[in-house]
UniProtKB/Swiss-Prot annotation:
One of its GO terms (molecular function) is G protein-coupled receptor activity. Residues 994-1009 are annotated as: Tethered agonist. Belongs to the G-protein coupled receptor 2 family. Adhesion G-protein coupled receptor (ADGR) subfamily. One of its GO terms (biological process) is fat cell differentiation. It comes from Rattus norvegicus. It is a multi-pass membrane protein. The modification Phosphoserine is found at residues 819, 1310. It holds the Pfam family ADGRF3_N. The gene is Adgrf5. Residues 954-1006 are annotated as: GPS. Keywords: Cell membrane, Disulfide bond, G-protein coupled receptor, Glycoprotein, Immunoglobulin domain, Membrane, Phosphoprotein, Receptor, Repeat, Signal, Transducer, Transmembrane, Transmembrane helix. This is Adhesion G protein-coupled receptor F5.
Length: 1349
């Protein structure tokens, strides 16, 4: 037994050996412990074969043998380690070779414990770490992964083992020998030989690495010979160990391989772990990057960006590197206050010998987004209000803080939930904390989010504290009488509010049209104004200022004393004749009002007399009898009126009653009710007092007109209004003055439809009742409120009654008395249609025998066209209306389109006073609830009831015609062919002509006519030729410019030609733009149309003025020969005249007329003619220039034909001058002819020939410019021939010119030229258009369309 003082040290060797012996027995221990007894290792398998024994013969086998050595002297350990390191492997023996030996486990006594450590690269198996006692205080392994120290040897083994995971080192090395193809064949002898020799050398060199397992050659590649191999080790090599191993490899390798030591190159796998904290980086965070590597090295670095810039310790960066237990390395980079500028690529490098390990990570910054309402308004009324701040970012917030800054200090209570990243700050401000009358004291509250890593994000909330408004209302008591006006002023000392409104004591809101609101810097004011008070205004009124949920209210009592309105006083007689000696009774009656008594006096001339009161049914009548006496003169006219005074001492007087006192000589007509009169006398009496039959106590309205014929009063006209309808008329007059008209209107419309149905018989016979209903509809349509479907149903029920065929006789009599009633009725219907609010409900189809209504609501993204059809079987009429999607797209969302059709209105509407042309179709009115972009194109189809005779016309109702009584107007509406059989139908559409003939013609041909089609074809074809020709002209001029501008005359001539072509080209393009704007596909954009009109005007004028410049320049060169102005002077004058004058004229025209919106036509983009004669700003300069050019041409031609001695310019100059005269002679007459034909088209009804000639000359003028202004120039011809190197043609041309035996192909005397001259009358052809349009729209027009025959 060993002594306790004996210090024993154990260590275990792993010996890997190879043997060629044949084994016929199981493996047994071949090395036993030197001190431990054999029975202590019973059952422990120390011999582990690497390969199974092959049956049948000797095979080289590899075995791993665990050898346990114990000794008492600790110093022996280092000696044995040194000895093992000095061995050169393989160690050859008799039949067995030792391939490698490694120390795995060392046990040393410490105190009373035996501590067993694993050598580097080895570890205790995991199960031993769990079941045995570990010595944690001495354990250098990373916690939680494995252990490398146990207390005592495990009794049943095993010893320390290589870890199951290992590190693969990929290495390349170069052999400085020639590469042979067999090295690519793994089965070749050369490949096997190289592989065996190299692996033996590699194994011998790398076995010294801790935890070495194996080495394998993987391939040979070219580049001399490059050897790729992998080394597997259990743990990372120590610094310098790879270099040392490489030296051993070269020492152990046969020198014939010529291995290059400097060619060792490591290719590591990713052995670096990279972590970023925090995972999501916010601006302001302190960010930590950590690289962890199992390779321990002192050579570590960090870099930034694509250029891999080195990072050093600074105020911004901090680098810290540590080695853990000598087996792993951790390097940390801390970036302080990370910003958007710091974002990018970051990487770490760990260099170990020939290996470089590292990784790269891109860092992005996430902005902190705080959600909060940036502005809040708080009323200091002690009600709590919450400010909310939330972060969109999911972050590890450490705290959320609230701060405030402002003139007043109002603190709140914070409530924070870090999990939801939200915080609430509750404020509760009372009146003592806010300055009185404060209308906007702002305090900035800031919520700040702070993350664990240092990032901060904040949001400012501007809170405006407003004190509760103190209202001051008109202090004086308000006491008025009916018919008088009053106003109530309500003042607030605070200017901040959300809403101001007035209501009655019953809570009924007053319509905003009755009050105004004004906001001041330190307060606000609202004034309720009633211009005509009624008894309904009697009561208490509340002025209410609302701010958020706080209400400030001021009240005022209003007393309205009853007093009849002047229009409510019924008088008898209105006018009468009486005998000078007889007494006469005057009567004034009003509706009885709950016993209200008035002081009533009658005023006769300058005297007043008290009246007697008598109640008759529902009327209170006041009478006075004028006693009979012989006046100072007879006959005599007397004016009498009654005067009502109420309890408030307010008064009203009636209209005057006229009494004519006569001596009685010629009196032939006498009646106790009507009175007396001489033959031919006409008087009016109220139906109420004319003996018209009525129920007792009822009040009827209207008047009866009588005429004395012979000895009898004959009733001329009767316009009486039945009592029920008269009552409704009086209610309608009161309703439009009522404070609650919105609330009363639906019930009133319902009562009106019921009463109209009951009074249908009276309406048929009484134009007065019919006129009263029209007046009622007119009054009610002015109420500013929305109309719903039920209200519209009641309105159409009323309309159905008054438009019945049986009422046509009443309509005829009514229109004889009041010709504007039909127009007034139609206007009322359109106002109701525009006020119809359909909302989300299904648009109703309202059907009656005499009126139908259909509608549609335009929703956002609406793609369906509006198309409605109306059929009236009883009237044998039908029609439909359509609006395309393009037009609907210009409407506001939720707009309502309403169409109302009437079969009988055609016979009722007033007819054209000149033509007396009736409408023989439906009348359809289409309205849109919101404003529309004009023109708004609409298509309609009507049934044609007059197939055999008459020409149909599409017309609309123009309210402004005939002194605003209205009439049919055909402006802007045309009959078109819709491609179907049109014998029984007429297709109408608003359209605008685009052919050139309309530029000056107010009486343009009808669309669809043969003339219109022909003019359009000529216009489009001509414009195409013109634009192409003008462009070609400019190209030709650019090509030959240097050749044809060698003298001043030619230079200036071509300057003029180029500018004429350029101006005409731009004018034609603008003309196309103008046509596109108004040609049926796009809404007329006013701004674009003004621009198009201006530029057409300007550039067409420029064409004329450049022609004038050309003429003046020719005149100057021929007449003032001795005077020679410089080229720059001529150019300055030319450009000033060519562009300056047109600019001045066109600018003045638009500046004077556009502010009054009379610059251009209503429905076309050209100068106005009807309103301002703006077209003269184009016509007058053009005519003057034509006359001047013609005069110059005559002078020039005369001068050329009869030259004088001494005046003859040089040969080249004369050639140029002759060309100029030729051009002027060709171009100017054509301009004159064009303008002459244009003037001819102005005359209404002008012959179609003028339209055709004008369009033809105007459209093709660009072609004429190219031919006669450019190509006829002999110098241009020569320059073009020379330009294209046509040597034969050019030489012949030159020769013939010099010898005079032939002429140029395009010269004036050539055969071709002569034919040209004969064709065009020896002149060129050039034309400039003078645009104008024909159609004019009427501003005050109806949406009602119909058909005239």
């Amino acid at each position: 037994m060993k002594s306790s003082r004996t210090v024993t040290l154990y260590f275990v060797l792993i010996v890997i050996c190879s043997s060629e012996a044949t084994w016929s027995r199981p493996a047994e221990p071949i090395v036993h412990p030197l001190i431990l007894q054999e029975h202590e290792l019973a059952g422990e398998e120390l011999l582990r074969p690497k390969r199974a024994v092959a049956v049948g013969g000797p095979v080289a086998e590899e075995y791993t043998v665990d050898v346990e050595i114990s000794f008492e002297n600790v110093s022996f350990l280092e000696s044995i380690r040194a000895h093992l390191n000095s061995l050169r492997f393989p160690v050859q023996g008799n039949g067995t070779d030792i391939l490698s030996m490694a120390m795995t486990t060392v046990c040393t006594p410490t105190g009373n414990d035996l501590l067993c450590f694993c050598e580097k690269g080895y570890q205790w198996p995991e199960e031993r770490c769990l079941s045995s006692l570990t010595c944690q205080e001495h354990d250098s392994a990373l916690p939680g992964r494995y252990c490398n120290c146990l207390k005592g040897l495990p009794p049943q083994g095993p010893f320390c083992q290589l870890p199951e995971t290992y590190i693969t080192l990929k290495i390349k090395v170069r052999l400085n020998i020639g590469f042979q193809e067999d090295l690519e064949n793994t089965s070749s002898a050369l490949y096997r030989s190289y592989k065996t020799d190299l692996e033996r050398a590699f194994r011998a060199g790398y076995r010294t690495l801790p935890g070495f397992r194996s080495v394998t050659v993987t391939q040979f590649t070219k580049g001399s010979v490059v050897v790729d191999y992998i080394v597997e080790v259990a743990s990372a090599p120590l610094p310098g160990s790879i270099h040392k191993a490489n030296e051993q490899v070269i020492q152990n390798l046969n020198q014939t391989y010529k291995m290059d030591y400097n060619s060792f190159q490591g290719t590591p796998s990713n052995e670096t772990k990279f972590t970023v904290t925090p995972e999501f980086i916010f601006e302001g965070d302190n960010v930590t990057l950590e690289c962890e590597s199992e390779f321990v090295s002192s050579n570590t670095s960090w870099f930034y960006g694509e250029k891999r810039s080195d990072i050093q310790n600074s105020d911004k960066f901090s680098i810290h590197t540590s080695i853990i237990n000598n087996i792993s390395l951790v390097t940390r980079l801390t970036i302080f206050n990370f910003t958007q500028h710091d974002a990018g690529l970051y990487g770490c490098n760990v260099t170990l010998d020939i290996f470089e390990y590292g990784t790269v990570r891109k860092l992005d910054v996430t902005p902190i987004r705080i959600l909060a309402k940036e502005e809040r308004k708080v009323v200091c009324d002690n009600n709590p209000i919450s400010l909310n701040c939330c972060s969109e970012n999911i972050a590890n917030w450490s705290r959320i803080e609230w701060k405030q800054e402002g003139k007043i200090n109002i603190e709140g209570t914070p409530e924070t939930d870090l999990e939801s990243s939200c915080s609430t700050y509750t404020l509760k401000a009372d009146g003592t904390q806010c300055p009185s009358g404060s209308s906007g004291t702002t305090v900035i509250y800031t919520c700040e989010f702070v993350s664990v890593y240092g990032a901060k994000g904040s949001k400012n909330i501007a809170v405006t504290f407003t004190s509760v408004a103190n209202l001051t209302i008109t202090p004086d008591p308000i006491s008025v009488s009916e018919g008088q006006s009053f106003s109530i002023t309500c003042l607030s000392d605070v200017s901040s509010f959300d809403e101001v409104y007035w209501n009655t004591s019953a809570g009924i809101k007053i319509h905003p049209r009755f009050y105004t609101m004004r906001r001041y810097r330190d307060g606000a004011e609202s004034v309720l104004t009633v211009k005509t008070s009624t008894r309904e205004w009697n009561g208490t009124y509340h002025c209410i200022f609302r701010y958020k949920n706080s209400y400030s209210i001021a009240t005022k009592d209003v007393t309205v004393h009853p007093l009849p309105l002047e229009s409510d006083i019924m008088m008898d007689p209105l006018e009468a004749s009486g005998l000078c000696t007889s007494s006469h009774q005057f009567k004034c009656c009003i509706e009885e009002n709950d016993g209200e008594e008035y002081i009533v006096t009658f005023h006769v001339d300058s005297s007043s007399f008290p009246a007697e009161r008598e109640v008759i049914g529902k009327q209170a009548c006041y009478t006075y009898s004028l006693p009979g006496k012989l006046p100072s003169r007879c006959p005599k006219d007397i004016d009498v009126f009654c005067h009502f005074t109420n309890a408030a001492n307010s008064s009203v007087r009636s209209p005057s009653m006229k009494l004519t006192l006569v001596p009685g000589k010629n009196i032939t007509c006498q009646d106790p009710i009507i009175g007396i009169g001489e033959p031919g006398k006409v008087i009016q009496k109220l139906c109420q007092f004319a003996g018209v039959s009525r129920s007792p106590g009822q009040t009827i309205g209207g008047t009866v007109t009588y005429k004395c014929v012979g000895s009898q009063w004959k009733e001329e006209t009767r316009a009486c209004i039945s009592a029920p309808i008269n009552g409704l008329l009086q209610l309608a007059k009161a309703l439009i003055k009522s404070p609650s008209q919105d609330q009363k209107l639906p019930k009133y419309l319902r009562d009106l439809s019921v009463s109209t149905g009951k009074e249908e018989q009276d309406i048929r016979s009484s134009p007065g009742s019919l006129g009263a209903i029209i007046s009622i509809l007119d009054l009610l349509s002015t109420v500013p409120t929305q109309v719903n479907s039920e209200m519209m149903r009641d309105i159409l029920a009323t309309i159905n009654v008054i438009l019945d065929k049986s009422t046509l006789n009443s309509w005829e009599k009514l229109l004889q008395q009041q010709s504007n009633q039909s127009s007034q009725f139609l206007q009322s219907v359109e106002r109701f249609s525009k006020a119809l609010e359909l909302g989300d409900s299904t648009p109703p189809f309202l059907f009656h025998p005499n009126v139908q209504m259909k509608s549609m609501v335009i929703k956002r993204g609406h793609a369906q066209m509006y198309q409605q059809k109306f059929v009236f079987t009883d009237s044998d009429l039908w029609g439909d209306v359509a609006i395309d999607e393009c037009q609907l797209g210009s409407l506001q969302p939720d707009s309502s389109i309403v169409t109302v059709a009437f079969p009988t209105l055609k016979a009722i509407l007033a007819q054209d006073g000149q033509r007396k042309t009736p409408s023989n179709s439906l009348v359809m009115t289409t309205t849109v609830s919101h404003n529309i972009v004009k023109p708004f194109r609409i298509s309609m189809t009507f049934k044609n009831n007059h197939r055999s005779g008459g020409k149909p016309q599409c017309v609309f109702w123009n309210f402004s015609l005939a002194n605003n009584t209205g009439g049919w107007d055909s402006s802007g509406c045309t009959v078109e062919d819709d491609g179907r059989d049109n014998r029984d139908r007429v297709f109408c559409k608003c359209n605008h002509l685009t052919s050139f003939s309309i530029l000056m013609s107010p009486d343009s041909p009808d669309p669809g006519s043969l003339l219109k089609i022909l003019l359009d074809i000529i216009s489009y074809i001509g414009l195409g030729f013109s634009i192409v020709s003008l462009a070609a002209c400019l190209v030709v001029e650019a090509m030959v410019w240097k050749s044809v501008t060698k003298n001043r005359t030619s230079y200036m001539r071509h300057i003029c030609i180029v500018n004429i072509a350029l101006c005409l080209l731009i004018a034609d393009i603008w003309f196309i733009v103008a046509g596109a704007i108004h040609d049926g596909h796009y809404p007329l954009n006013e701004t674009a149309c003004v621009a198009a009109t201006f530029f057409i005007h300007f550039f067409y004028l420029s064409v004329f003025f450049w022609m004038l410049t050309l003429g003046l320049m020719l005149f100057y060169r021929l007449i003032f020969i001795l005077h020679d102005a410089s080229k720059s002077t001529q150019k300055a004058i030319a450009f000033s005249l060519g562009y300056g004058c047109p600019l001045i004229i066109s600018s003045i025209t638009v500046g004077v007329t556009q502010p009054q919106e009379v610059y251009m036509r209503k429905n076309a983009c050209w100068l106005n003619w009807e309103d301002t004669r703006a077209l003269l700003a184009f016509a007058i300069p053009a005519l003057i220039i034509v006359v001047v050019n013609v005069s110059i041409t005559v002078v020039v031609i005369t001068k050329i034909l009869r030259p004088s001695v001494g005046d003859k310019p040089g040969k080249q100059e004369k050639s140029s001058l002759f060309q100029i005269s030729k051009s002027i002679g060709v171009l100017t007459p054509l301009l004159g002819l064009t303008w002459g034909f244009g003037l001819a088209t102005v005359i209404q009804g002008s012959n179609a020939v003028f339209h055709i000639i004008f369009t033809l000359l105007n459209a093709f003028q660009g072609l004429f410019i190219l031919l006669f202004g450019c190509l006829w120039d002999q110098k241009v011809q020569e320059a073009l021939l020379h330009k294209f190197s046509l040597s034969r043609w050019s030489s012949q041309h030159s020769k013939s010119t010099s010898l005079g035996s032939s002429t140029p192909v395009f010269s004036m005397s050539s055969p071709i030229s002569r034919r040209f001259n004969n064709l065009f009358g020896k002149t060129g052809t050039y034309n400039v258009s003078t645009p104008e349009t024909t159609s004019s729209s009427v501003e005050n027009s109806s949406s009602a369309y119909s058909l005239l025959n």
